[in-house]
A protein has these predicted regions:
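Conserved alpha-helical substructure of the radical SAM core
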Residues: 1-112, 123, 127-135, 139
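Radical SAM enzyme [4Fe-4S]-AdoMet core and its adjacent flexible, acidic
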Residues: 12, 30-35, 39-42, 84-87, ...
Length: 222
């Protein structure tokens, strides 16, 4: 049997979410109740212990469709990865990533934290993420950046954004850069809207060659 070169494992440690983003399947159609809870820590560690002997040290993403920072014991999951020589990544709306949770997660050896920020100003953020948290998230991202520097942590700080109007790509990229990416200093990914939830029904027939949503052509894709 061919040996699988496993580079990334996505383990959902919390299935629910505290946001109701316009473009996300967590909002519409939603998830079954049995998925809206935490994965027990011992089950998580058991999974890690099955991975490492067979596949070495792939990257561990601590989320799937859920919001990982809603798991109150998040630093323990990160530490479990660190103890086994595994990198841990978190993709999050960032609304809980502050105070002790932020500091303890970074201290536990978190490899990367990515803020999802859809909308390049307060008004558009509110529209697409359905909550008026632009200023708060901006501050949390700054606090995270500062704590990483203060502690000489190797944790990377990223951000993720979507183009909202395909006819204004250059303008929106510039706005994301000026309003969030450059002031905070994140490594950013800006994608075209890709309707991955299937929430939107196009009223046209797609003609010609299909185009990419803009995912980075890297070895590790999200």
């Amino acid at each position: 049997m061919e040996q699988i070169n496993l580079q990334r494992v996505v383990i959902e440690i919390f299935g629910g979410c505290n946001y109701t983003c316009k473009m996300c399947p967590q909002t519409t159609p939603g998830r079954e109740k049995q998925f809206l809870r935490s994965m027990p820590l011992d089950q998580f560690e058991n999974i890690l212990d099955q991975i490492t002997p067979k596949y070495g040290t792939p990257l561990i993403n601590l989320e799937g469709s859920g919001e990982p920072t809603m798991n109150k014991n998040l630093p323990q999951y990160i530490e479990a990865c660190t103890r086994r020589g595994l990198r841990s990544y978190i993709y999050s709306n960032g609304s809980n990533f502050t105070g002790n949770l932020m500091r303890d997660s970074i201290d536990a050896g978190l490899s990367l934290f990515r803020f999802s920020v859809i909308g390049y100003n307060r008004e558009l953020y509110h529209k697409w993420m359905n909550v008026d948290n632009w200023d708060m998230i901006y501050q949390y991202a700054c606090d995270t950046r500062d704590y990483i520097k203060q502690t000489n942590s190797k944790c990377k700080l990223d951000s993720y954004h979507l183009i909202l109007d395909p006819s204004c790509v250059e303008y929106e990229v510039d706005q994301y850069q000026q309003n969030f990416i450059f002031p905070i200093g994140t490594e950013a990914y800006i994608w075209k809207m890709h309707n991955w939830s299937g929430n939107y029904k196009p009223d046209y027939e797609r003609l010609g060659q299909r185009r990419s949503c803009g995912r980075p052509a890297a070895d590790e894709l999200t």
